Amino acid sequence: MITSEDIRERGVPDFKPGDTIRVEYRVVEGNRERTQAFEGLCIARRGSGISQTFVVRKNSFGVDVERIFPLHSPKIAGIKVISRGAPRRAKLYYIREKVGRKARVKKAR
């Protein structure tokens, strides 16, 4: 069971939709465990408390990939903010229809 003390200890960085983040999560393959990175644009954050989730979108070899991560999952090894964005919306689902330069978010000052 995860307690509120465990949540504070994890030290989750402050990030918002529009920020480019790198999520390192643990993957179990057979009897081995390794860390895999997923770097992309955070397009949404939802929920509160222990059940918070966030959506990260990236382009991998010409294919757009979205992944939903539980914020306080023990599978997440770390979250790092690469750059800050300054969108005008809380949910950036409109990015799904955009391609190329139009799919970018303005950088924060």
Swiss-Prot record:
Single biological process term from Gene Ontology: translation
Gene Ontology CC: cytosolic large ribosomal subunit
One Pfam family recorded for the sequence: Ribosomal_L19
Keyword Protease found: no
InterPro entries named among the record's database cross-references: Ribosomal_bL19 (IPR001857), Ribosomal_bL19_sf (IPR038657), Translation_prot_SH3-like_sf (IPR008991)
Signal peptide from the UniProt entry: none
Presence of keyword Acyltransferase: no
Primary role: This protein is located at the 30S-50S ribosomal subunit interface and may play a role in the structure and function of the aminoacyl-tRNA binding site.
Protein family: Belongs to the bacterial ribosomal protein bL19 family.
Protein name (record): Large ribosomal subunit protein bL19
